[in-house]
Amino acid sequence: RFQEEHRYKKPVAIYWLQSAAVRLTGGDSASSIYRYRLVSVAAASAAVLVLASLGTYMFGVEAGLAAALMLLGIFGLGFEGRVAKTDATLLAATLVVQAALARLYLGARRGEATGRGWWWTFWIAMGVGLLVKGPITPLVTGLTVAGIAIVDKDRAWLRRLRPAAGIALALLIAAPWFVAITA
């Protein structure tokens, strides 16, 4: 609820995360706004670190550092990282999905064993993305997968995504919210 109005328009993750941040820092619902903003600060910081890791994996240390510094220098990230909104958290979740996708795809192309860790990371972050802002993370990821499939005709790497089980996991993560707003 916000000012006595139910807030079903936005998915619930940001509210849950902000409530946890307030509780973990010893506050209550009437606490100073900075406690609510901690989620955005943490998410913006995580996004920079994930991009550094992704860039390093794909192109080397210099590229990873350059990408992270560019993201860090973007005015929008600085702004979104200081407000109690969903965008920094959405960016972090989406970047985690993209990083896991890169590990799965490039791992297959390079003949690397990726294990199940990146699969779990991909689909859990997808579920979190659904809870943060609905279809945005799946849409971005779907476009990425489609782009790769157009460029790379060998689609054997898609088996690493195990989409049936993965979609079920992501929906299982998001299901409590979907059930709550329809009940």
Regions found by a protein language model. Give the residues of each.
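Membrane-integral, polyisoprenol-dependent glycosyltransferases
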Residues: 1-183
